[in-house]
Amino acid sequence: MKTLLLTLVVVTIVCLDLGYTRRCFNQQSSEPQTNKSCPPGENSCYNKQWRDHRGTIIERGCGCPQVKSGIKLTCCQSDDCNN
């Protein structure tokens, strides 16, 4: 009986899919490469590039933000796709 109950609990956990989250790189161009899990429901990663007095700046993270003109934005929907 205990084995049956344990089996049902395991099957329930597997079937519920305990919440997959997207993983994206999340560093600025001057920082070491890191990635993180995005908040639940956030299914996109972005790579944002622009130029200023320091040169080309690259920012990466979760989501797909609105940007001003002159900023190159690439959004994607797979893990670590924004490198």
Swiss-Prot record:
Supply the CDD domains for this chain.
Answer: TFP_snake_toxin
Signal peptide extent? 1-21
Q: Can you cite an annotated GO cellular component? A: extracellular region
Return the Gene3D superfamilies for the record: CD59
Disulphide bond pairs: C24-C45, C38-C62, C64-C75, C76-C81
Q: What InterPro entries would the database entry show?
A: Snake_3FTx, Snake_toxin-like_sf, Snake_toxin_con_site, Toxin_cobra-type
Q: What does the record say about tissue specificity?
A: Expressed by the venom gland.
Q: Does the keyword Disulfide bond apply?
A: yes
Which keywords does this Swiss-Prot/TrEMBL entry list? Acetylcholine receptor inhibiting toxin, Disulfide bond, Ion channel impairing toxin, Neurotoxin, Postsynaptic neurotoxin, Secreted, Signal, Toxin
Q: Where in the cell is it found?
A: Secreted
Q: Which PROSITE patterns match?
A: SNAKE_TOXIN (PS00272)
Q: Does the keyword Thylakoid apply?
A: no
Q: What is a GO molecular function of this protein?
A: acetylcholine receptor inhibitor activity
Q: What does this protein do?
A: Binds to muscle nicotinic acetylcholine receptor (nAChR) and inhibit acetylcholine from binding to the receptor, thereby impairing neuromuscular transmission.
The entry's family comment says: Belongs to the three-finger toxin family. Short-chain subfamily. Type I alpha-neurotoxin sub-subfamily.
**Entry protein name:** Short neurotoxin VAN-29
